[in-house]
UniProtKB/Swiss-Prot annotation:
InterPro entries: eIF3-like_dom_sf, eIF3j. Pfam families: eIF3_subunit (PF08597). Residues 60-71 have a biased composition (Basic residues). Component of the eukaryotic translation initiation factor 3 (eIF-3) complex. One of its GO terms (cellular component) is eukaryotic translation initiation factor 3 complex. Residues 46-56, 72-81 have a biased composition (Basic and acidic residues). This is Eukaryotic translation initiation factor 3 subunit J.
């Protein structure tokens, strides 16, 4: 009887051992379960995390297109206003407006050409007001620009007085030494101008003076030194 019980116990033990996973160490099943839990948590976090869409890139194109459309509309409205204003102008105003637009176009063309050639302008503004010279070359450019500007008024009767008034105001802030240097420069210019003006007119002469020494043939004695003068009158008439 005891043998039967022992045999039955061994049989049950074998069945239980066969069902167990002999390749697993103790606690490995718990690790597998834990790893599975972590994987599930990561998948849930990925699902719960907000999807990062390329919304800035997608929205940038429509936004840029809308801005371009708006700018184009504003340009059209501005052109329409300018056309209406131009139509309401007098012929003189229209001519002045055309000249202004032409000047702006020329300035833009010049600016484009300078940028193409890599030429850096002396200033960021336009015209004399935009010039801010610091070097000798830049001051020379400023002087030329002012000279060209004033050249438009040379024919005016007030031009001479304007220059005198301008010089007084400009030289008032200079020292006496600098004024003397400027005066020397003007004096030299005056002399050069005077030479040019005199060269255009024939010189007038009232008479020619001739001095000579006469010698008697065969002798070394000087008889006399005399002077003959030819003037506007005749010597014979004077003798008579």
């Amino acid at each position: 009887m005891e043998d039967d019980w022992e045999a039955l116990a061994e049989q049950k033990a074998e069945q239980l051992f066969a069902k167990a996973d002999v390749n697993k160490w103790a606690g490995e099943d718990e690790d597998d379960v834990k790893d599975n839990w972590e994987d599930d948590d990561e998948e849930e976090e990925k699902k719960d995390a907000p999807k990062q869409e390329d919304t800035p890139t997608k929205n940038a194109k429509p936004k840029k297109a809308a801005q371009q459309k708006k700018l184009k509309k504003e340009d059209l409205e501005r052109l329409q206003r300018e056309e209406e204003e131009f139509a309401n102008m007098t012929p003189e105003q229209q001519l002045a407006e055309k000249r202004r637009l032409q000047k702006l176009q020329e300035e833009n063309d010049l600016k484009t050409a300078m940028e193409t050639l890599g030429i850096t302008p002396m200033s960021t503004g336009n015209g004399i007001d935009g010039m801010h010279p610091t070097t000798k070359e830049e001051f020379t450019e400023l002087a030329e620009a002012i000279s060209k500007k004033l050249a438009n008024y040379r024919a005016s009767t007030e031009y001479q007085g304007f220059l005198e008034e301008l010089l007084l105001k400009l030289f008032a802030s200079l020292s006496s030494n600098n004024i003397r240097k400027a005066k020397t420069t003007l004096d030299n210019l005056y002399l050069e101008k005077q030479k040019v003006e005199k060269g255009d007119k024939p010189k007038k002469t009232k008479g020619i003076k001739v001095k000579a020494k006469l010698r008697v043939e065969g002798e070394n004695t000087t008889l006399n030194e005399y002077e003959t003068k030819y003037d506007d009158y005749d010597d014979y008439d004077d003798f008579m």
